[in-house]
């Protein structure tokens, strides 16, 4: 969306909300006390007006991709871009006494070409003023930026913003909105991990994926001493517009976001993703194919967890597949889902740079009836940790047509543990490896004659110990092949049970094998459901090779 189109949209919103008239001296004084950087014209603002603005915008053609930036910004290297720092003396709420939160902005440049507009809102009068770009808001350090190219470019805007929380004001941020509609938050470890997005469009279709942009933000000024604030956002893309309201709670051990969105479709949409999240899984206990490093595991998230509308809890360990995989788990009014990082043991990662053991989980809790649809999971092959290869979102069953209006309410929890968990036994870990031999016997002098793949799933909690004397029964369902050598082993170190079985192929097919298992005692389920997708090797690879023999 170009600047002229945005201004027209802003004028439409002003018409809906009412003209500001002559601002009172009190209103001007309030803005001055909150921030010395809001310098635009004073206009009225409220969420209803933003919804009207987004709806009106959807009836007009999309403004297109962002225009070019000045050369000195467009050609920045990642190192140069990262050296540009916002001047904390010009933070948004620098003038608020006893502030517990503050806002700083990201500079446009490098790949961040969308010029995002920022507004400060007086919560008492509902009046807003724009914050225009000017070079003196930033410290350019060794970035090599020619600031003379930036003089007078007040419409340059910003790339995004980040939130700081006391006592780490201006030092360590806890929330970040940067690029398209991406945003992230941390728990009490201050370690970023996976990302969320405002919306996903056509992630897995025969066409090009579309990435909507947050093109403007309005910040309600946080109250003195408060760790909660509200920010509103306008979303825009070729297919849809949206009005968003984020109420962000920056708590001691987690960040919680209450999200309300109103979406307006410009055109038919093949696949709409609600509450999308993006993560990375390179290797873990269950997948060691590309993990030839000193790090035993490399991942931002280790599983997809789902609390289905019928009350069933599901654990689906993530994979780094050999080819792209897309799975849709059908549901009706889901209770929650998320990408979790539950393994918090440093020794399982041995990474003093990435600190994967400290990365947060992200849980989505619908706050309204979402109806029928699917929790969709896409896993993309990756050979390293720098590419996000896992995408998850809710896909409504109903097709989206041009002119449709939709609304969703949900809560996001950025925390070490999800806010709820199954009262039944839970999956702690999934391991895979060579099969076809008795447990306790390791290949040495000879290898098994018949190829098989072993799966070991560790369960903890619930009523496992009470159920053991009565008999624990693993209920295993496979889309192909056979499960043999099934064992139930008590493991004292984690005070739980390991269910182990070997998968034997019954054909030469290399199609993914869908596996499903839960534990039962006297006809009643006593565990959450474990789902897995295994990719069998080609028939000529289904043999063991003695590594001691040089070939």
Swiss-Prot record:
PROSITE patterns per UniProt: TAT
Record-level GO BP terms: beta-glucan biosynthetic process
One annotated GO molecular function: carbohydrate binding
Location, primary (coarse class): periplasm
A family per Pfam: MdoG
InterPro entries given in the database record: Gal_mutarotase_sf_dom, GH-type_carb-bd, Glucan_biosyn_MdoD, Glucan_biosyn_MdoG/MdoD, Glucan_biosyn_MdoG_C, Ig-like_fold, Ig_E-set, TAT_signal
Pathway: Glycan metabolism; osmoregulated periplasmic glucan (OPG) biosynthesis
Family, as annotated: Belongs to the OpgD/OpgG family.
Protein name: Glucans biosynthesis protein D
Provenance organism: Salmonella enteritidis PT4 (strain P125109)
